[in-house]
Amino acid sequence: MFGRNFPFFNSIGGFYPRESLDSKRPSGSGYTSKVRVRDKYHIVGFISSGTYGRVYKAIGKDGRKGEYAIKKFKPDKEGEIIQYTGLSQSAIREMALCSELDHPNVVQLAEIILEDKCIFMVFEYTEHDLLQIIHHHTQPQRHAIPAPMIKSILFQLLNGLLYLHTNWVLHRDLKPANILVTSSGAVRIGDLGLARLFYKPLNSLYSGDKVVVTIWYRAPELLMGSRHYTPAVDLWAVGCIFAELLSLRPIFKGEEAKMDSKKTVPFQRNQMMKIIDIMGLPRKETWPGLVSMPEFSQLQSLAMSRGYINRQCNLEGWYQSCLKNNGYSPGSAAGTPGAEGFDLLSRLLEYDPTKRISAREALEHPYFTTGTPVTANCFAGYEGKYPHRRVTQDDNDIRSGSLPGTKRSGLPDDSLMGRAAKRLKE
């Protein structure tokens, strides 16, 4: 269905021949048995941890050149007793999809290793992610990400997303921390833990995962409780990322309401308010499917209580203010995304998912086809330097020289490789 036999867009348009990527892909992709991690990789240090395990930076041994990020899945645990009860659905999906997907704008899996009942996913190493880059541009004082860099990042992101969607894969967790960037300026979509196939599903996507996409990047149809959704949810997230690259802060920074003890999914009232503040109140005249949404009555209640009935879209006002505050103009060092940038943003942040622009349509938008040409290296022409990813030795697994079988926990559920700068709780 995908990967090995499918042609795809390259990062500057056109299609890659199948052979060109196979020759670049690390050999041995997929499951490897009776191999020890330390026999093949030198562990440089610890990157990050989270719910499901830990991530380490490593260098290949014995002619296996390059740097790698090794993601270690921990076994389930009760107290001090390790219970080998299996892997999470998220881990299984990520391994299955990453073993098949093969595109220059999707993170590359080198191999999977099973050692002492621990599973390791070995990925190519990426030095940066968009969250780290955004954070860098806010320190020590705010300075805009150059418009040509944003254009390249966005094009490569959409290019990878087109490949996923063409191969019936929804990512469902696009956000700056999950968009990786190599030191040579190549953008990779990472963390496929929430990704899933959407080709003729036996049940609604909602029945399998009731909550998807980090709250600030969650599409309105998801907030409205839609049981059926499409690749459009990923395009809304791209719009949020585009806005964040421009403004250096999340455009819809709401507070998430947590599930109750009965695991009932609550209406995300605060997040919907943040969207309405800028996008105006969604209306059935422009979004016919709105009235059939499970949370429509909640939206009506919100509109009445907050005086949102007459709230109109002010995205253009937000956009112009963003350009002014961050110094985007035709004669500035940062350049400008121009009117084309606003038009693309407005089509990505379209309330009605049936009208929202697709990845393929977005790649053909005048924002990319006019003005400064898109570069395959997003850092091209940029004279600044971004800090390297933070790698430490402060980890029991490293100090003990034993990666598998430890009692430590963690693995980033929000980033394949971790990140240098941690954001406030998302």
UniProtKB/Swiss-Prot annotation:
Residues 41-368 form the Protein kinase domain. GO terms for molecular function: ATP binding; cyclin-dependent protein serine/threonine kinase activity; metal ion binding; protein serine kinase activity; RNA polymerase II CTD heptapeptide repeat kinase activity. One of its GO terms (cellular component) is mediator complex. The active site is at D173 (proton acceptor). Its main location: nucleus. ATP binds at I47, S48, S49, G50, T51, Y52, G53, R54, V55, K71. Pfam families: Pkinase (PF00069). Its EC number is 2.7.11.22, 2.7.11.23. InterPro entries: CDK (IPR050108), Kinase-like_dom_sf (IPR011009), Prot_kinase_dom (IPR000719), Ser/Thr_kinase_AS (IPR008271). It is found in: Nucleus. Keywords: Activator, ATP-binding, Kinase, Magnesium, Metal-binding, Nucleotide-binding, Nucleus, Repressor, Serine/threonine-protein kinase, Transcription, Transcription regulation, Transferase. It comes from the Eukaryota. It catalyses: L-seryl-[protein] + ATP = O-phospho-L-seryl-[protein] + ADP + H(+); L-threonyl-[protein] + ATP = O-phospho-L-threonyl-[protein] + ADP + H(+); [DNA-directed RNA polymerase] + ATP = phospho-[DNA-directed RNA polymerase] + ADP + H(+). Residues 390-426 are annotated as: Disordered. Belongs to the protein kinase superfamily. CMGC Ser/Thr protein kinase family. CDC2/CDKX subfamily. Component of the srb8-11 complex. The srb8-11 complex is a regulatory module of the Mediator complex which is itself involved in regulation of basal and activated RNA polymerase II-dependent transcription. The srb8-11 complex may be involved in the transcriptional repression of a subset of genes regulated by Mediator. It may inhibit the association of the Mediator complex with RNA polymerase II to form the holoenzyme complex. The srb8-11 complex phosphorylates the C-terminal domain (CTD) of the largest subunit of RNA polymerase II. Component of the srb8-11 complex, a regulatory module of the Mediator complex. This is Serine/threonine-protein kinase ssn3. It comes from Aspergillus fumigatus (strain ATCC MYA-4609 / CBS 101355 / FGSC A1100 / Af293).
